[in-house]
Amino acid sequence: MDLGSGSSQGGDLETTFQLWLQLLLWAHLAVRFLGYLHRTFRGPKPQPAP
């Protein structure tokens, strides 16, 4: 996937893309973890009796 505009530029673009991908992944995990902690500390909702 080299556009021929310079190998260094292509490498930087690929590295930047990987960094953004990792950042999004970690942000997603952090949001899920914070949501889990929020639900845990807030206490379980009272379940309706069957």
UniProtKB/Swiss-Prot annotation:
It is found in: Membrane. The keyword Transmembrane helix applies. The keyword Transmembrane helix applies. Its main location: membrane. Keywords: Membrane, Transmembrane, Transmembrane helix. The chain crosses the membrane at residues 15-37. GO terms for cellular component: membrane. It is a single-pass membrane protein. This is Small integral membrane protein 46. The gene is SMIM46.
